């Protein structure tokens, strides 16, 4: 199972495991995304549009901050953990180590764009 780490904003819903088997017999029918509060407004719009224009449910987006999102993402694999995290920075080596220790392997980091506050 691959989980995604998205750098900047989350537009790569197509890469997430929509019906990924998590725990024995457990599944969810939506994508769970956590992360950056600066990316939250854009990610919400993209998620709503995705839900309207695809055969999938609208992803659930939570604003937890980049660090908080990565902490949740790296905590483990299964329906109780998010599928994707948005961050306004790159993943740290220590976060990668935590992910690997908790069974979150094959992380894919995708740079979607840049953000900024003016």
Region spans (language model):
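N-terminal segment of the mature folded domain
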Residues: 25-118
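Bacterial N-terminal signal peptides
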Residues: 7-17
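Positively charged n-region of N-terminal signal peptides that target proteins for export
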Residues: 1-4
């Amino acid at each position: 199972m691959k989980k995604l780490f998205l750098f900047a904003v989350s537009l790569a819903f197509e890469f997430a495991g929509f019906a990924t088997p998590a725990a024995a017999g457990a599944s969810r029918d939506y994508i769970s995304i956590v992360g950056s509060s600066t990316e939250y407004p854009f990610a919400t719009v993209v998620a709503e549009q995705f839900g309207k224009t695809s055969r999938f449910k609208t992803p659930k987006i939570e604003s937890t901050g980049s660090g908080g999102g990565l902490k949740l993402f790296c905590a483990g694999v299964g329906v109780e953990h998010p599928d994707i995290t948005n961050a306004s920075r790159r993943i740290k080596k220590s976060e990668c180590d935590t992910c690997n220790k908790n069974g979150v392997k094959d992380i894919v980091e995708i740079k979607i764009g840049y953000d900024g506050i003016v």
